[in-house]
Amino acid sequence: MLKRFFITGTDTSVGKTVVSRALLQALSSGGKSVAGYKPVAKGSKETPEGMRNKDALVLQSVSSLELPYEAINPIALSEEESSVAHSCPINYTLLSNGLASLSDKVDHVVVEGTGGWRSLMNDLRPLSEWVVQEQLPVLMVVGIQEGCINHALLTAQAVANDGLPLIGWVANRINPGLAHYAEIIDVLGKKLPAPLIGELPYLPRAEQRELGQYIRLSMLGSVLAVDRIMA
């Protein structure tokens, strides 16, 4: 059965891409074929090959198949287009068709979101509405920093309110000098309604590294046998 996961974060720049990379590498090392999917990528740059986004390129680099960029990132928005003040319709059918196409080709598709759970697209709708439509199980990335406990609990509650399961969370140490790191992890472990499936240490250029060893797929249990959550 095909399996898809949606990666959300407690905020922007908390490490969704490196955690997506880690999850893809962990699944691949277990003999599964994988693909990363960045439905909407903000802050993309013009290149001779067209609009490209650095996060989507990371996902493309660890996908099992040689896929065209557009298969990984169907909507690439420039810096100007990324502003919610820039009204721009989002073709959600295009996003769904792209996800379905990837799901037909590989065992696992890791779908990376944009910003946090309620981050708005240019049509002033959160991407989470599309995630609900697709009925994708959710993994949350918590950037361990001041205030992250509040952000993590609010995100978990929002996911639950939208009727989707939070199947796990990953701690990403984005601030190596943060005091009380262990205490924060302990509190989150007690308060979040999902298992901790990995801890990523602070690593320079993490997006270029092998990260699969930091993910404990066994903590996901039977979830790996689920394609989508049935309504």
UniProtKB/Swiss-Prot annotation:
It catalyses: (7R,8S)-7,8-diammoniononanoate + CO2 + ATP = (4R,5S)-dethiobiotin + ADP + phosphate + 3 H(+). Keywords: ATP-binding, Biotin biosynthesis, Cytoplasm, Ligase, Magnesium, Metal-binding, Nucleotide-binding. Its cofactor is Mg(2+). InterPro entries: DTB_synth_BioD, P-loop_NTPase. Pathway: Cofactor biosynthesis; biotin biosynthesis; biotin from 7,8-diaminononanoate: step 1/2. Its EC number is 6.3.3.3. It holds the Pfam family AAA_26. It is an enzyme of class 6 (ligase). The keyword Metal-binding applies. GO terms for biological process: biotin biosynthetic process. GO terms for cellular component: cytosol. One of its GO terms (molecular function) is ATP binding. It is found in: Cytoplasm. ATP binds at residues 13-18, 55, 112-115, 172-173, 201-203, 208. The active site is at residue 38. Mg(2+) binds at residues 17, 55, 112. Catalyzes a mechanistically unusual reaction, the ATP-dependent insertion of CO2 between the N7 and N8 nitrogen atoms of 7,8-diaminopelargonic acid (DAPA, also called 7,8-diammoniononanoate) to form a ureido ring. Belongs to the dethiobiotin synthetase family. Homodimer. This is ATP-dependent dethiobiotin synthetase BioD 2. It comes from Salmonella typhi. The lineage of its organism: Bacteria, Pseudomonadati, Pseudomonadota, Gammaproteobacteria, Enterobacterales.
